[in-house]
């Protein structure tokens, strides 16, 4: 009996603690997508013409997080058969990313978008060993040689590709990009900012389900009116 008397306060204290903790767990708050988002003008967050959903990315070729996310983005795009809209957003503190983006634009416009993607992938793979613009040029030169391409002495004599990179960066500033990579899954009607790369597939699944659930626009057959003459 004495033991029971000693145990009773312990049991009561344990039950009290459980009751105190339970409401806290029940009220655990889970943030919603885009909650507390700081994006400003989101008008550009649309898939390309003809696509219902896409991955929209602002990236910096000198950014380690971009290098880690790049293959996952491509795997997701291939898995779901959806396009990637890729924007250059070279950060001010990075010494060679802007020039590398210009080389990527050269390859995209002069060779092919696929070759530009391969170049970006090569730059990300070599990123840790690039400490200067000279290092970046060595990697670029090696890329051209291994792909059987003639490397121009001046890739952008008219400044066209520089303007394209600057236009992308201006779009990022307009959107309010504060870090790279900035990954967003977009449809014609909404977008979700993916702040954790691990949630990319789940986000695509969610938005793709919404897109598939949308009623298809009924095709209206124009009615031909008979032409009468007075």
Protein language model regions, located:
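C-terminal cap of thioredoxin/glutaredoxin-like
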Residues: 141-230
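Sec/Tat signal peptide C-region and signal peptidase I cleavage site
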Residues: 22-26
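Structural alpha/beta surface segment adjacent to cysteine/selenocysteine redox centers
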Residues: 56, 61, 67-145, 175, ...
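Envelope-exposed proteins and targeting segments
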Residues: 51-54, 80, 179-181
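Bacterial N-terminal signal peptides
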Residues: 12-20
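A short beta-strand-turn-helix
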Residues: 35-53
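Periplasmic c-type cytochrome electron-transfer domains
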Residues: 27-38, 133-141, 216-229
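Bacterial N-terminal signal peptides that target proteins for export
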Residues: 2-11
């Amino acid at each position: 009996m004495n033991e029971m008397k000693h145990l009773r306060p312990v049991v009561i204290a344990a039950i009290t603690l459980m009751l105190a903790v339970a409401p806290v767990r029940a009220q655990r708050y889970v943030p919603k997508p885009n909650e507390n988002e700081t994006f400003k003008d989101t008008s550009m967050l649309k898939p390309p013409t003809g696509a219902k959903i896409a991955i929209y990315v602002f990236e910096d070729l000198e950014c380690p997080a971009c290098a880690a996310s790049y293959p996952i983005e491509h795997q997701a795009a291939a898995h779901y058969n959806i396009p990637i809209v890729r924007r250059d957003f070279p950060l001010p503190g990075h010494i060679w990313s802007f020039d590398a983006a210009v080389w990527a634009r050269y390859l995209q416009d002069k060779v092919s978008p696929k070759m530009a993607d391969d170049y970006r992938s090569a730059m990300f793979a070599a990123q840790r060993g690039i400490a200067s613009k000279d290092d970046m040029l060595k990697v670029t030169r090696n890329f051209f040689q291994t792909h059987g391409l003639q490397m121009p002495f001046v890739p952008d004599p008219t400044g066209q590709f520089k303007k394209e990179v600057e236009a992308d960066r201006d779009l990022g500033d307009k959107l309010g990009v504060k870090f790279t990579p900035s990954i967003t899954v977009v449809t014609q009607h909404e977008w979700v900012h993916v702040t954790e790369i691990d949630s990319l597939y789940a986000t695509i699944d969610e938005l793709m389900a919404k897109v598939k659930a949308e009623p298809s626009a009924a095709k209206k057959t124009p009615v031909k009116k008979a032409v009468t003459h007075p």
